[in-house]
């Protein structure tokens, strides 16, 4: 049953919304996360209104004091929101009116909820981007420090999840450092498109009042205002960029967690995770499960979904504002909270894990990952590489049938294969030698890994 419409926008209506319809349209359950930013935006707006003589300095001071009181109450957890006021903007105006009286109604002069909500979201995301960039810097530092400790730790390098060539564990970690550095660069670029003020665009066409958009932008800490009022209220690209960047970040974290999950299994035993980041089983007493790594891997799905959700919302929206845009917030909030916690979890998990360097190195001696070394050895002595590749492949087949490895083959047998092979072949086949010799730029050679780490430390 409908009643008389008492909404702040209700002048044009004869009846109010049914309660269940009102609840469907309300967003206060989630957009209250914007409360602090809504108040800060309003403080900047009313300061400008007073400075420009659009409202009296006395009224501006009264409104500003009321807003500052509400901000303190919000930070103290004392504000209560009402679903009948729909969203954070109407709730704040209602609370302000209750605090200072009808003069609160002057706050909305030369402003619409359209530019107001866009401003709130720019402020929120700008703050979150700073937090994400800082946490990424911490994770990258953890990786560099861990890599520095394990420059000389040898592990199997993989292709197709099969042993390929021995590499430095530090080199492996630095590959992830590079991924997370690119993530950081993307978020830093994201700041550029977030650092714009929509305030003053009003509903879509600007306003007849002599406002100063540069002033409010400066008061809120933005680089500049949007140059087009339609774009200002309808643009959500900055959120889509954030969700896209977050999806790539989660993909990188998921890939790393997948490896950590494998490394701490009985089959690998490369690392041991701290109890802080592990859980047990309700039935199997022996279990120590890498749940936090699995959760990061799993949560990548929800972050991807948030990106696709907003892309779908935006794909057919005409200019300028549409109620569909209410659906831009929950995914943004969820993604921001997910990646900030995941970054802390991954950094903590990596910094506290124990690396079984001896077992890592031993695993490179129980495979044929030194096969390329033998082929390169022959090629370096003048044999065409393709011929060397063929010879080594046949020798591996022979070794596989006889149950031994290349380093176990007697010199006499080697010399029946090629008189180019001498005693020094055994040094070549050692994993440490194989890694050390790969000194091409960006390679896994120890000096190259040290150089990568030194460059990373400069960047950090």
From Swiss-Prot:
Keywords: Amino-acid biosynthesis, Arginine biosynthesis, Cytoplasm, Lyase
GO cellular component: cytosol
Pfam families: ASL_C2, Lyase_1
Location (main, coarse): cytoplasm
Protein location: Cytoplasm
UniProt cross-references to InterPro entries, sorted A to Z: Arg_succ_lyase_C (IPR029419), Argininosuccinate_lyase (IPR009049), Fumarase/histidase_N (IPR024083), Fumarate_lyase_CS (IPR020557), Fumarate_lyase_fam (IPR000362), Fumarate_lyase_N (IPR022761), L-Aspartase-like (IPR008948)
Record pathway: Amino-acid biosynthesis; L-arginine biosynthesis; L-arginine from L-ornithine and carbamoyl phosphate: step 3/3
A GO molecular-function annotation: argininosuccinate lyase activity
Biological process according to GO: arginine biosynthetic process via ornithine; L-arginine biosynthetic process
Reactions accelerated catalytically: 2-(N(omega)-L-arginino)succinate = fumarate + L-arginine
Protein EC: 4.3.2.1
CDD domains documented for this protein: Argininosuccinate_lyase
Enzyme class, UniProt record, top EC level: lyase
Family: Belongs to the lyase 1 family. Argininosuccinate lyase subfamily.
Protein name: Argininosuccinate lyase
Gene: argH
């Amino acid at each position: 049953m409908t009643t008389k419409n008492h909404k702040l926008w209700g002048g044009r209506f004869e009846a109010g919304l049914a309660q269940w319809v009102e609840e469907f349209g309300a967003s206060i359950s989630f957009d209250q996360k914007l409360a602090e930013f809504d108040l800060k935006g309003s403080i900047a707006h009313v300061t400008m209104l007073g400075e420009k003589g659009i409202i009296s300095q006395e009224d501006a001071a009264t409104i500003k004091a009321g807003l500052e009181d509400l901000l303190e109450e919000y930070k103290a957890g004392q504000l209560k929101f009402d679903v009948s006021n729909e969203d954070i903007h109407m709730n704040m105006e209602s609370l302000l009116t209750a605090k200072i009286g009808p003069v609160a109604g002057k706050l909305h002069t030369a402003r619409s909820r359209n530019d107001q909500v866009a401003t709130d979201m720019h402020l929120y995301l700008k703050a979150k981007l700073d937090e994400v960039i800082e946490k990424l810097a911490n994770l990258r530092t953890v990786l560099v420090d861990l890599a520095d400790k394990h420059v000389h730790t040898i592990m199997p390098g993989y292709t197709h999840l099969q042993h390929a060539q021995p590499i430095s564990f530090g080199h492996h970690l630095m590959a992830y450092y590079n991924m997370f550095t690119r993530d950081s660069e993307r978020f830093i670029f994201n700041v550029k498109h977030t650092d714009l003020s929509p305030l003053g665009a009003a509903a879509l066409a600007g306003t007849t009042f002599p406002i100063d958009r540069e002033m409010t932008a400066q008061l809120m800490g933005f680089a500049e205002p949007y140059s087009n009022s339609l774009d200002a209220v309808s643009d959500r690209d900055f959120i889509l960029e954030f969700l896209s960047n977050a999806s790539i970040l989660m993909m990188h974290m998921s890939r790393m967690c997948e490896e950590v999950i494998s490394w701490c299994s009985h089959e690998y035993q490369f690392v041991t995770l701290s109890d802080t980041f592990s859980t047990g089983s309700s039935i199997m007493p022996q279990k120590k499960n890498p749940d936090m790594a699995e959760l990061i891997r799993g949560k990548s799905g929800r972050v991807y979904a948030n990106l696709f959700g907003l892309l779908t919302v935006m794909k057919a929206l005409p200019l300028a504002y549409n109620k569909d845009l209410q659906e831009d917030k929950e995914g943004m909030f969820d993604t921001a909270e997910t990646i900030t916690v995941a970054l802390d979890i991954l950094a903590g998990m990596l910094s506290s894990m124990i690396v079984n360097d001896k077992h890592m190195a031993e695993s490179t001696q129980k495979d044929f990952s030194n096969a390329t070394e033998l082929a390169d050895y022959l090629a370096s002595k003048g044999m065409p590489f393709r011929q060397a590749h063929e010879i080594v492949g046949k020798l591996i087949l022979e070794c596989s049938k006889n149950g031994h490895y290349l380093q176990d083959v007697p010199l006499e047998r080697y010399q029946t294969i090629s008189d180019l092979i001498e005693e020094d072949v055994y040094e070549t086949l050692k994993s440490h030698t194989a890694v050390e010799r790969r000194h091409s730029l960006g390679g896994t050679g120890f000096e190259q890994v040290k150089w990568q780490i030194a460059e990373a430390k400069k960047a950090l």
